[in-house]
């Protein structure tokens, strides 16, 4: 399936100069979204996944149906102040700013094989920070899966040594 047919490009959002890749048309088409999730699940099935981890917020949209299909848990990575129990945190940069990501301290057991999912790989800052959180808790990142990769931002360079799946590249 040609997933790019379901991505809307929004100019100058969230700020001038950004060409935002809107995945909501893909999500709105049940067959297209199922096909995208199925491709990630097929990839994950080769990895013996114990847990799916996804950063806020669109990583939840991708990760939850993948974890459901794999019959494994999902651990959310959230912005600072959004998780109610004890967390670990890491600072990170993204395509259009700076932020802090957190995960519950007990979200990952040492040795768990983790798939990280998100909608988009841009500069790689969000996923690099997510990997740091997973590894600080003793998880083993066995793959990263994205709907969209912005190749011109070289985010994949930050994921050297990790297996990466992207369904679309711009």
Curated annotation (Swiss-Prot):
The family classification in the record reads: Belongs to the purine/pyrimidine phosphoribosyltransferase family.
Its source organism is Oceanobacillus iheyensis (strain DSM 14371 / CIP 107618 / JCM 11309 / KCTC 3954 / HTE831)
**Which proteins does it associate with, and in what oligomeric form?**
Homodimer.
Which biological processes are named by the entry's GO terms? adenine salvage; AMP salvage; purine ribonucleoside salvage
Q: In which pathway does it act?
A: Purine metabolism; AMP biosynthesis via salvage pathway; AMP from adenine: step 1/1
In UniProt terms, what function does this protein have? Catalyzes a salvage reaction resulting in the formation of AMP, that is energically less costly than de novo synthesis.
Instruction: Recall the GO molecular function terms of this protein's record.
Output: adenine binding; adenine phosphoribosyltransferase activity; AMP binding
Localization, UniProt: Cytoplasm
Reactions catalysed, as given in the entry? AMP + diphosphate = 5-phospho-alpha-D-ribose 1-diphosphate + adenine
- Name the coiled-coil region(s): none
Q: Does the keyword Transferase apply?
A: yes
User: Which keywords fit this entry according to its UniProt record?
Assistant: Cytoplasm, Glycosyltransferase, Purine salvage, Transferase
- InterPro entries xrefs: Ade_phspho_trans (IPR005764), PRibTrfase_dom (IPR000836), PRTase-like (IPR029057), UPRTase/APRTase (IPR050054)
User: Mind telling me which Pfam families this protein's record contains?
Assistant: Pribosyltran
Which EC numbers does the record give?
2.4.2.7
Q: Which GO terms describe its cellular component?
A: cytoplasm
Q: What is this protein called?
A: Adenine phosphoribosyltransferase
Keyword Zinc-finger among record annotations: no
Signal peptide residues on this chain, from the entry's feature table: none
